């Protein structure tokens, strides 16, 4: 499951009128005329507890727009990245960019002729204001931007960003996950990170039409630079929980969803096999985090290799994840097939989908372990034993934890399950108060970042971890390896593709042999959609964008949709 920290999302579409070409390389063209409304609903899972509060501030992570992934309807980044196609970058408010000064300076040429939804022109002053806001207010840095030393707007169509260190590796966070806001409306806010924005103004393809605690409605922006979208209305209704949203989806009231739904075929696709579809591409690598700071057997790479060999990934996929998340095939940790181009070929298909008890025995015997009187592997009187901690509310991860514990016992490793409340789990993982945990992949920009470097940084960068008891930004296992750190630093300081791949190979092989985390499955980007009334979806045969209804992609996808004929 790709748990998005506090939320999972379902979005839905109902009908729209207008004619627009669907293009995989850019936005849709002009809409046609007509009066039939198009409706889209984004539904929050019950675990989120999202309250409909009229706040569309993109800097505020607790705003309605942020929590339901509606920012990209109203605001736009400089460029749009396709997580499924690394290197494919679509111009949005920016048209081109260039690095200089050893990766410390990024110059962006901005699109001309763009207007905000209130008719005011968009210029470099707005882009500069956005980045200066993040520079001066850490609480506004929702996209995790690196330290900015200065921002300049030498003319109306040029933005210059200067950073403290080389930032080649953070291109997505800078260009693809920072939403540009209008200076003329945001500059008057007392605290831009928390001030409510009830009447949003942006350059995005939609504008706010109405807001109630039961439904929020957007309509297409007639001033949008890409041409008025063919899908001319977007509705976001309130549902009390995931079950209510699933019922609405099955009843045909929603056309687009992003929820994990058990028995999906029975509840959804079988209702209308011609029109009801789903596609769950792998958007992250789910791993078993290993806490090495507490010492003991888990600090031994050979023990971690043995644990990996004892895991039945196929069983996790089928029983824990309903068959929606494919077993990991490579010990590199890369998301496959999306990141195939970055894979060290010798690490291809080196993970068995099933457990290999013989390999477990071979690894541990060579490492000085033998079975004790209880049938568990031990050395010097100390058994290999650990708990797998996951929230009981994350039913799939909790099921995975139970399966792993059983699989370990079957190969002579004494593992148990520690089911906790979700808030406690987040704190325990960040503070290092756990032994192992099933956890989704991450990195700068999360699952929308197409580049693998962020994942390795998330798993291995010791500048982002913390001592036990203190909250870590990432590297929750407190892994420390000077070779890995050197590769991370080298990658960050080069824009040469061959040199970057060299460093990625080093990191992939460290992940493979040291296993600071153990790859389990490819976490799904949840995406259910209906073609009964809407066409132009991102599909496996036309993956023009990561299909899940999440920011920053959802606004881009909406502009590629059109009513079915």
Task: Show which residues each predicted segment covers.
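Ligand/substrate-recognition segments at binding pockets and active sites
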Residues: 213, 370-444
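Aromatic- and charge-enriched surface segment that lines or borders ligand/interaction sites
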Residues: 95-138, 154, 160-162, 245, ...
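N-terminal lobe/hinge region of extracytoplasmic solute-binding protein
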Residues: 45-101, 132, 201
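Detector for C-terminal structural segments
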Residues: 36, 220, 311-345, 358-361, ...
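Gly/Pro-rich hinge or "lid" segments in bacterial periplasmic/extracellular proteins
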Residues: 84, 176-228, 233, 357, ...
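Surface-exposed binding/hinge segments that line
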Residues: 43, 98, 109, 143-187, ...
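Alpha-helical secondary-structure segments
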Residues: 123-130, 156-162, 204-205, 232-233, ...
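Extracellular/periplasmic solute-recognition and catalytic clefts
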Residues: 141, 150-152, 209-219, 235-295, ...
């Amino acid at each position: 499951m790709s748990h998005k920290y506090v939320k999972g999302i379902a979005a839905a579409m109902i009908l729209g009128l207008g004619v627009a070409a669907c293009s995989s390389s850019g936005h849709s063209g002009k809409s046609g005329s007509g009066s039939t409304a198009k409706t889209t609903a984004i539904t929050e899972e019950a675990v989120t507890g999202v309250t409909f509060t009229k706040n569309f501030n993109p800097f505020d992570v607790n705003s309605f727009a942020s929590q339901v992934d509606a920012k990209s309807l109203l605001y736009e980044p400089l460029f749009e990245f396709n997580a499924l196609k690394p290197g494919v970058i679509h111009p949005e408010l920016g048209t081109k960019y260039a690095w200089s000064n050893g990766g410390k300076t990024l110059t962006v040429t901005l699109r001309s002729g763009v207007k905000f939804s209130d008719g005011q022109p968009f210029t470099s002053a707005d882009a500069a204001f956005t980045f200066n806001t993040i520079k001066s207010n850490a609480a506004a840095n929702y996209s995790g931007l690196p330290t900015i030393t200065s921002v300049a707007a030498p003319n109306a169509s040029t933005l210059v960003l200067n950073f403290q260190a080389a930032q080649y590796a953070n291109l997505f966070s800078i260009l693809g996950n920072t939403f540009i806001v209008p200076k003329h409306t945001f500059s008057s806010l007392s605290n831009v990170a928390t001030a409510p924005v009830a009447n949003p103004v942006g350059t995005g393809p939609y504008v706010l039409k109405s807001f109630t605690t039961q439904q929020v409605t957007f309509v297409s922006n007639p001033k949008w630079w890409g041409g008025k979208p063919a899908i001319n209305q977007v509705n976001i209704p309130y549902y009390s929980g995931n079950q209510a949203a699933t019922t609405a989806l099955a009843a045909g009231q929603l056309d687009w969803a992003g929820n994990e739904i058990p028995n999906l075929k029975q509840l959804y696709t079988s209702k209308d096999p011609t029109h009801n579809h789903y596609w769950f591409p792998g958007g992250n690598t789910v791993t078993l985090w290993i806490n090495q700071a507490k010492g003991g057997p888990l600090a031994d790479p050979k023990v971690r290799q043995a644990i990996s060999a004892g895991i039945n990934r196929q069983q996790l996929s089928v029983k824990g994840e309903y068959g929606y998340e494919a077993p990991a095939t490579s010990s590199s940790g890369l998301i496959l097939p999306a990141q195939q181009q970055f894979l060290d070929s010798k690490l291809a298909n080196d993970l068995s989908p099933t457990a290999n008890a013989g390999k477990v025995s071979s690894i541990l015997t060579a490492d000085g372990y033998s079975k004790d009187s209880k049938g568990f592997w031990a050395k010097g009187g100390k058994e290999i034993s650990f708990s797998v901690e996951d929230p009981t509310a994350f039913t799939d991860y909790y099921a995975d934890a139970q399966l792993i514990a059983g699989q370990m016992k079957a190969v002579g490793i004494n593992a148990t399950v520690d089911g906790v409340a979700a808030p406690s789990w987040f704190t325990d993982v960040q503070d290092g108060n756990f032994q192992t945990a099933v956890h989704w992949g991450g990195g700068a920009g999360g699952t929308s970042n197409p580049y693998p470097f962020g994942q390795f940084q998330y798993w291995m960068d010791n500048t982002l971890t913390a001592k036990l008891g203190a909250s870590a930004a990432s590297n929750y296992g407190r892994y420390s390896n000077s070779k890995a750190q050197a590769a991370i630093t080298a990658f960050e300081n080069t824009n040469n593709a061959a040199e970057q791949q060299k460093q990625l190979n080093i990191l992939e092989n460290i992940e493979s042999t040291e296993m600071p985390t153990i790859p389990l499955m490819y976490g799904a980007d949840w995406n259910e959609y209906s073609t009964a009334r809407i066409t132009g979806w991102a599909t496996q045969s036309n993956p023009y964008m990561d299909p899940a209804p999440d920011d920053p992609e959802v606004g881009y996808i909406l502009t590629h949709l059109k009513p079915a004929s």
